[in-house]
A protein has these predicted regions:
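Non-catalytic interface/linker regions that flank or bridge core catalytic/transmembrane domains
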Residues: 1-39, 152-158, 162, 174
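Divalent metal-dependent catalytic cores for phosphoryl transfer on phosphate-bearing substrates
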Residues: 37-50, 55-174
Length: 174
């Protein structure tokens, strides 16, 4: 699970209305495949604002190594969150719930088989898998899809090259 300071920054940032600046939106969409743009647009305004910042930091950190698939990975790493339909306060409850259950995959899977708010919490906690599935269906580069699936895993479980994963992770937890 993300560090407390990262979660606090994301929470307070999500309270600010609006998405990224128009220039950042235009830049972000220029980094995405046509099939990825609808996924980007389905993300919440705060998630898009956060993701644009992550991608800009990745671009600065990696320079020429920040290829289109790497920047798409930065922009779409949280795309699975949109499947839950939870707002800011629901996400807070989901994050706390995930911590309480130790992110037990069997409990999370059971929650996704229910209805209403509990199902949405389960979906939110599965956002890495759901995001990877969405990106796979969109025909995203394997690196982009893998990072969505792996961005909450320990480094020794990443399949993306370590230098790229470290830059993506550092930019997200900045």
């Amino acid at each position: 699970m993300a560090g407390l300071s990262h979660l606090a920054r994301r929470f307070f940032g999500s309270l600010r209305p609006g998405g990224p600046r128009a220039a950042d939106t235009e830049w972000a969409e220029s980094q995405l495949l046509e099939t990825e743009i609808p996924l980007w647009r389905a993300m919440s305004a705060p998630d898009r604002r956060h993701a644009a910042g992550v991608a800009r930091r990745v671009e600065l950190a990696l320079g020429d190594e920040a290829t289109r698939p790497v920047l798409a990975a930065a922009l779409l790493h949280d795309v699975g969150k949109s499947e839950s339909g939870l707002g800011t306060y629901g996400r807070v409850i989901a994050t706390i719930s995930g911590g309480v259950i130790g992110r037990d995959p069997e409990i999370i899977k059971a929650w996704t088989r229910t209805r209403g708010f509990t199902r949405r919490v389960g979906l939110y906690l599965q956002h890495p898998k759901l995001g990877g599935d969405l990106l796979g269906m969109a025909g995203s580069d394997p690196l982009t899809e893998s990072w969505a699936r792996e961005h909450h895993l320990p480094e020794d479980q990443w399949t993306v090259p370590a230098t790229l994963g470290l830059a993506l992770h550092a930019a997200d937890d900045d």
